[in-house]
Amino acid sequence: MNKEKTIIFSMPNTHVLAQEICDELKMKLHSVNKTIFADGEVLLSSKETVRSKDVFIVASTSHPANNNIMDLLIFVDSLKRASAKTINVILSYYGYARQDRKAEGRQPIAAKLLADLLQVAGISRIVVVDLHNPSIQGFFNIPVDDIKAQYILSKEFTIKDEKFTIVSPDHGGTIRARIMAEIISNDVKIAIIDKRRVSTNKTEVLGVIGDINNENAVIVDDIIDTGGTIVNAAEVLKKNGAKKISIVASHGIFSKGFDIFEDADVIDEVIVTNSIDNYELAKKYKKLKIVSLAPFLSKVIRSIMDSKSVSDIYAKYLESK
C-alpha cells in the first residue's frame, strides 16, 4: 500500500470511526473544511492537495440523512475538480436503503436515486456496510463492496462459553441469521419470529418458529430503528421460554432513543457496530455495547490499494477463529 499516494478524509459525523481506521493503518486522518453560509448552503473542500492521489472518504448518511448526503456529494465534487486519481467512499451506513422498491403506486425508489447521485458526483468505488437489500448493489455502475457485519459481530459470541440460538426477527432476515450462525459454529441453531407489518414502523408479532425454550437467544438484524418491534420480539421469546436475550444489529439508529431497551427487563444487552456514532449513548446506558468496524474496514482499504481480493479477508477471518 503506497501511503504517500493515499489520503483518508472523515466526514463530520464519522470522525471516531475514521480515526480508528487511520490508527489501524498508521496513517494521518485529514479533516474536511466545511463552511455554512447564512442562507444554509454549505461549502466543503480539502486543505490538502489531492491531485493524482487515491482518496478514501469515511462517511455515513445517517441522521440527519439529507444534510449528510448533501455534504458528501459536495465534498466528492470538490475532490473530482481537484484532480483526485480515485475517490473511494467507505459508507458505513447507506441512508434510504429501505426505499429500495415501489411498495405502492407513485412511490419513489430513493435508494436508486442516491446511487445515481453518488456516481454523478464522481465516486470511483463504494464500500458499504450491510446494505438493507444486497440488490442495491445493482443500482450502481461502479464497483460496490457490501461488507457483512456478521463477521465482526460474531466475535462477541465465539468467545463466550455458552450455548445460544440465533433468532431472525422476520422471515426476510433468515439468510442473515443463518450466515451468522454458521460463522460462529455449525452447531448453532436458528429460530424465526413470525410477524406481519400493519403500518410504517409498526409490526405485529404472531409467534416463534423453532424451539427457544431454555435457550439463550440472540436476535440478529441489520437495522434497529424505533425499537418497538425488537422489544416485542424479545417479549415473545421470553414467553416461549428463552433465558438471556441479546440484540445484535449492524446499524443502531435509535430514532426514539435507547430508553426502550434499557427499561425492557426481557433484554440483557444490545450490541451494534459504530457505523453510526452512538458513543455518547453507550456512556449513558449500561446495556449498549459498540463494536468497532475499524479493524475490518482498514483491511478492506489495504486490499483495495494492494489490488487484492476483499473476499480473502472473510476467508482469513474464518481461518483465524
Swiss-Prot record:
Its EC number is 2.7.6.1. NCBIfam families: PRK01259.1 (NF002320), ribP_PPkin (TIGR01251). It holds the Pfam family Pribosyltran_N. The gene is prs. CDD domains: PRTases_typeI. The active site is at K195. Mg(2+) 1 binds at H132. SUPFAM superfamilies: PRTase-like. It is found in: Cytoplasm. The keyword Cytoplasm applies. Mg(2+) 2 binds at D170. Belongs to the ribose-phosphate pyrophosphokinase family. Class I subfamily. D-ribose 5-phosphate binds at R197, D221, D225, T226, G227, G228, T229. This is Ribose-phosphate pyrophosphokinase. Its cofactor is Mg(2+). Homohexamer. It catalyses: D-ribose 5-phosphate + ATP = 5-phospho-alpha-D-ribose 1-diphosphate + AMP + H(+). ATP binds at D39, G40, E41, R98, Q99. Binds 2 Mg(2+) ions per subunit. GO terms for cellular component: cytoplasm; ribose phosphate diphosphokinase complex. One of its GO terms (molecular function) is magnesium ion binding. GO terms for biological process: 5-phosphoribose 1-diphosphate biosynthetic process; purine nucleotide biosynthetic process; ribonucleoside monophosphate biosynthetic process. SMART domains: Pribosyltran_N (SM01400). It is an enzyme of class 2 (transferase). Pathway: Metabolic intermediate biosynthesis; 5-phospho-alpha-D-ribose 1-diphosphate biosynthesis; 5-phospho-alpha-D-ribose 1-diphosphate from D-ribose 5-phosphate (route I): step 1/1. Keywords: ATP-binding, Cytoplasm, Kinase, Magnesium, Metal-binding, Nucleotide biosynthesis, Nucleotide-binding, Transferase.
